[in-house]
Amino acid sequence: MTRKGLDIVQGSAGVLIGAPTGVACSVCPGGITYANPVNPVLGAKVLPGETDLALPCPLPFILFRAYSSYRTRTPAPVGVFGPGWKAPFDIRLQIRDEGLILNDSGGRSIHFEPLFPGEISYSRSESLWLARGGVAAQHSSQPLSALWQVLPEDVRLSPHVYLATNSLQGPWWILSWPEPPAYRVLTVVVDGFGRSLTFHRAAEGDVAGAVTGVTDGAGRRFHMALSTQAQRAEASRKQRASSLSSPASPRSVSSSQVFPDTLPAGTEYGADNGIRLEAVWLTHDPAYPDEQPTAPLARYTYTAGGELRAVYDRSGTQVRGFTYDAEHAGRMVAHHYAG
């Protein structure tokens, strides 16, 4: 099945490896998800997308998490939820001399041949178009010619911008660059009416390149509170010191609770900079400019190894929990729901 919408998680249940272009490294992790504890086709643990945040509007920001223990040979860097997990804005396009590799929201790699400016390539197995900017308009014979015109002119004319869509009605996923020409990241989603969902990325500092804010189709603004491994380690040390100084607290702390200041630079799921999403805040709503929430809409905690440990809703209630193999970072061995 193909999921239409804001996330690129789709694909044929039997992609033929070796086809000329638009070829996935595996079958779709979001397809067959029964037969616990693993996907019977991939031989990997797969959890379909779980939605943590979705405020309705014409082009909403839907924050979901999808997990797969499948490891592609050409991975994107580890995302903000840690190894194995992907968020909708973790889509990345690798620009290589021999071709293009689209890392989707399911953790897969979809391979395309290089594109000339203005060229569009279609993957039949994935039902996905990948395009490159560089022309003001597409020829009328191109099925995406009408959808092309809803894009801002600067996007259409830039040969450095790539775009993807899985429908003739949109939306477009606009893949721009922080450091050309090595890769492109998701910066904007544009629907068939020209409305946009914008992902704001830090230009400098410890979290440079990461998404720190989102503006949805209604003009609502969200702040993505991020942390580095060093910051989590420092917070853990302060918490331990506070616990040990309290007469009512135990005098020993398990070594499993000790956070290292750094994480291994490379994992089976790709390079890991240690940046994680701690919380999501609604900071502006045009409909209620003077009434903003005093608590985050969602909050997350992590293990000492940077793996997603727990998810909390806006009431502070833990709604999900996860356990991982101590010998293999990111390999989930158990998960539970609230209650």
Segments the model singles out, each with a brief description of its role:
Residues 34, 41-43, 91-92, 132, ...:
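Nucleotide/phosphate-binding site architecture used for ATP/NTP-dependent chemistry
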Residues 45-50, 86-88, 94-98:
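Short alpha-helical segments and helix-capping/turn motifs at coil-helix boundaries
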